[in-house]
Amino acid sequence: MSCNEKNRGVDDRETEQPVFRNSVEAQRIPAIQNGSITAQQLTIDDNLLVDPKLLFIGSKIGEGAHGKVYEGRYRNQIVAIKVLHRGSTPEERAALENRFAREVNMMSRVKHENLVKFIGACKEPLMVIVTELLPGMSLRKYLMNNRKQQLDPRMAINFALDVARAMDCLHANGIIHRDLKPDNLLLTANQRSVKLADFGLAREESVTEMMTAETGTYRWMAPELYSTVTLRQGEKKHYNNKVDVYSFGIVLWELLTNRMPFEGMSNLQAAYAAAFKQERPSIPGDIPPDLAFIVQSCWVEDPNMRPSFSQIIRMLNAYLFTLPTPSPSSPSSPKSDTTETATTSNGAITEFSARARGKFGFLRQLFAAKRAKNSQ
């Protein structure tokens, strides 16, 4: 199953050519993680493989914990080529090959205009994923380059809608991204929209709902991913796709404030503050109450109280409709029609405008029910 798709090609370029072998092993090999066999090795269909003779690798444009990303060329397209680490032991190799196959299979299955387009993969002698190359920068770099001022509200909401639509597509296909953050959101050439990238930590929702807490970057991670004792990597935890909604709430806060979440804290300090002290980034008083409510509904502690991405899309569209038509004389930040706002840092929901109460009544009833239950 796929979502709405909008594809676009790019042009041509050259550099050095790696030697690839176009083959995929058909057998299933046990994948070993944390010293025990957890799953069978996944395989990649031949129709997902690109012709290695047409693939050229150029200069490095990025690097992460699991691999490096290069600019390259495939046929007549400039592409992004992600080369993943193999591992140094048989156990690491099996686990990383399984992760690679999972990422390829998920990326090839979902198509949406706000998801980076998957082109193909190679397995030998390097594990490679080929995607479209977006000429724009990451949302993280874009925000840092404009750190002295907040984004135009309409632009911030449009970016948020792009992300929410991409995530709604993933969730509709039973995929949890688990690493939603500005580094994995890439701007298009005109810097008017963003696309979601990097499925390296994504997982399909399973019947057992047992997944490892190795995921994501702590500053954006949902509290339920943490252990009640420690933050041991690889520990099994019960969670669902609402972990992505929490991360989206942090990203939306960044778009509205253009600040780093949990400023002044290390990643582990931020994780501890969110998980054990129920702290959240403070919401400035100039953030309209309607938007403050959306942010806080996303990062509320109880995952079941968080909205779905389809609900988030409706709320953001409803707010976007209230903004004045852009004009050269319009102020960059629209004024709210209310004086009450939410500025608490612990995720609690405070009073908002009559307009917000009517617009988001279905969610407010959920929060009221939760507060009543907790007070008993």
Question: Whereabouts are the PLM-identified features?
Answer:
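Glycine-rich ATP phosphate-binding loop
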Residues: 70-88
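Short beta-strand micro-motifs within the conserved protein kinase catalytic domain, predominantly
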Residues: 117-125
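A conserved loop-to-beta-strand element in the N-lobe of protein kinase catalytic cores
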Residues: 124-132, 140-141
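Activation segment signature within eukaryotic-like protein kinase domains
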Residues: 159-160
